[in-house]
Amino acid sequence: MNYSQLKPARLNLGWSQQQAAAHLGVTQAYLSMMERGLRSPASVAPRLMKVYGLSPTVLPVNEVRDEVSADTLAHELALLGYPGYAHLRKGGQAGNPASFLLTALGQRNLEARTAEGLPWVVLKYPDMDSTFLVREARTRNLQNRLGFTVTLGRRAANRSDLQPLEQQLVDSKLEKEDAFCKELNSAERKWLQGHSSAEARAWNLLSDLTPSSVRYV
């Protein structure tokens, strides 16, 4: 979380430091130091998000997980506000969307409805830490999957603000053919080799997802 967000968020609520500190459960002196960048807000980030009404992008990025159940990922996407999973939103707190996105993209077999929701995450949270996203995607060889996700979102909503992130991923695109979050049998692979979308082929991926597949834009 960038400390420079704190003072504008407080002032937007019309609160003095003393009032905000009381809502946050910290001292005025501690809040003052956080607003000046002298103390890290990471330990109170969830409280800041709730009290100030900030985006979950302010939360610390968590470790990218390798194997996560389909139900867990669906619930986490619901907590981020995905309309398609509104019925799963009860219980729990949203995590950092960048951590969720990379975790989902790294799954060997991601549930199709969850995969369709990933471009929505990119559109909903354009302020995700792009440095973290690109670095971790490259580390895990996920840049093509992430790039495809960004392309789908950008074209579905005509969002030029996503082009810088997309270009960073283009610059490190992998040449090896991959499937989008799904292990394919030989019949599925053969079919998708002839029916993958232009956007997927541009990222050397096998997938029939298109910008028109992106919902809730």
List the predicted regions and their residue ranges.
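Helix-turn-helix/homeodomain-like alpha-helical modules used for DNA recognition
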Residues: V64-D127
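Charge-dense, extended regions
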Residues: L162-V217
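DNA major-groove recognition helix of helix-turn-helix/homeodomain DNA-binding modules
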Residues: A42-P60
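An accessory alpha-helical subdomain
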Residues: V121-V122, L133-N141
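Short basic helix-loop element that most often maps to the first helix and adjoining turn
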Residues: S4-H23
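Recognition helix of helix-turn-helix/homeodomain-like DNA-binding domains
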Residues: L24-S40
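Residues within the helices of the helix-turn-helix
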Residues: K7-P8, Q18, A29-S32, P46
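Small-residue-rich helix-loop
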Residues: R138-Q168
